[in-house]
């Protein structure tokens, strides 16, 4: 985190800044974007359910990145990276003759967009190459870091993704400057388009702040204090140089990135052991960001007219701070300078608030002139580590115990750069550590032999004879599996964590009913395992199998014999290996598939349904067929009748779509906030149905209505069942990485 923010561009709508995508004074050509979203900016954007399509991928259909990475000589790649780090280029000279600190910042900012609330952001897809991240003020001049790495990427081609290369380079930078890293796991496959499914904030101006309410309460799911920053403003909240106030921002933003206080101190101090910030002159010398720069800049941005515009004249954050006397060598120098000097406020050459050591010797080297020395300097957010009553004792302990600090930084850096990769089983390469960490949501080894087809048939019968209804079986399986997030590959049915805190107490899961269902399922499990010899069934498998049995029964009653695919092999997680606080972030505040809408949601239910479908990696047709099927199967929260547009609940029919599209029904809101509606017979006025926004949207939105019409057609009854089963199976197996 060696360069914290950028004071260059202040208006995302200004000419040349690549800001607001809507041209308010004219219609856009289709090649410019806009289109329907310009005319109706609040319409549902179903394109987020079709991201990274195969047609956008230039690689061969049979290309397997994991296999390509496994064949890579990682040591050779690291040697080539190391050579880049100490080979200064005239077009962007290296500070202190070493690009290592720049590359640490690049890797940090690639990973540091991750947030726990929805699992989005992070380094997993190499999104730093694309807008908006490539042009965020906080990522100023990281375009040069990536361009410096092009010779390495060019040499190894598709054997190493940009996503992996950015993080690996951060590790190599640390290692070549004397630090022992905790490890590295590859496996981050690149994508080929910018993400449109991440909400970065409500602001339309760089570095604006409209994301707080009340007593500085940061809007969910955001993880930064201002638009275009990774975490906090290094000058202090909204530029106010108050270390105590800044500490509050630091604690909240780092918490939202899954870091505790000790990890936060280690990361800030460790990152600021290296390199410097850049604020040689006024920000008005700096040009457009990469996305807005002219064609001839070839993807580079922030061209500066201040002096040479580079090296000693570089401007990025507007701050001019070097923290230690050995900025290209691992040391405890950050804490030494933090505690051994008193600091007074000053302004950088660019006019930014920073702190300089009082009456201190000039012990800090100049980045480009070996004859010059400087006094130690700190950012407002650095001083937070000394003056905040929680951070201070941690910082002092690290100062007095350098080995403990080094271990804490190594582990925190590893967590930072791998948090969004999912389970450890997905990590690739020879440098993956043996140690499994709690934040990786570990699962135990499977006990006993797998059940076979005969056992599966027996268990299905027992489940259907257990007294549990189709609704209960289906709802429990959905509640377990639908915790999965494709964003950071957390959650899912494997582990059966639905039986553990915090999931067993989540409001969306109807805790009382869930407890009853789990008791029954555990009885079936225990009875089977006691009489099955070496073969054992996990509760995780049994929950999913119960859902399959329920769906098959409902389909049969609709007149269709179908088998729901089921592959055993899930295991049951333990409380010891479940971080309750970490899993609290996965609690749904809404689940349109169960017609659940919790309190305090900013967006209407239909938007939240789309967001949930996106996190489950569903397409628009899959979302549509699942909603229609779950409604008639009675899978609603608290057995609500909202959206149950059928006279035969528990039977897998296409009634939801047939009755929603019936022109003999008129709809009217029944709540002031227009969250619930009733459908009346147009002729008699009799109330026929009740629905939510997550139901009526399938008749209201033109694209979703087109999908609903497919499933409402007379010839679609069997197709509906088959498509529902396929989409259901996809969700149930979303976290079965062992099957890929």
UniProtKB/Swiss-Prot annotation:
Amino acid composition bias (Basic and acidic residues), ranges on this chain: 1-14
Cofactor entry: heme b
Gene3D superfamilies referenced in this protein's UniProt entry, alphabetically: 1.10.520.10, Peroxidase, domain 2
Site (Transition state stabilizer): 105
SUPFAM superfamilies hit by this protein: Heme-dependent peroxidases
Entry keyword Heme: yes
CDD domains: catalase_peroxidase_1, catalase_peroxidase_2
Gene Ontology biological process terms in this record: cellular response to hydrogen peroxide; hydrogen peroxide catabolic process
Residue segments, region Disordered: 1-21
Cross-link position per record: Tryptophyl-tyrosyl-methioninium (Tyr-Met) (with W-108): 231-257
EC class (word): oxidoreductase
Record bears the keyword tRNA processing: no
Keywords noted in UniProt: Heme, Hydrogen peroxide, Iron, Metal-binding, Oxidoreductase, Peroxidase
Catalytic activity, EC: 1.11.1.21
GO cellular component, one term: cytosol
Tryptophyl-tyrosyl-methioninium (Trp-Tyr) (with M-257) crosslink location in chain: 108-231
Free-text remark on how the cofactor is bound: Binds 1 heme b (iron(II)-protoporphyrin IX) group per dimer.
GO terms assigned for molecular function: catalase activity; heme binding; metal ion binding
Protein modification: Formation of the three residue Trp-Tyr-Met cross-link is important for the catalase, but not the peroxidase activity of the enzyme.
Residues annotated as binding heme b: 272
Residues the record marks as active site: 109
Catalysed reactions, semicolon-separated: H2O2 + AH2 = A + 2 H2O; 2 H2O2 = O2 + 2 H2O
Biological role stated in the UniProt entry: Bifunctional enzyme with both catalase and broad-spectrum peroxidase activity.
Subunit and interaction comment: Homodimer.
Protein name: Catalase-peroxidase
The organism of origin for this protein: Streptomyces reticuli
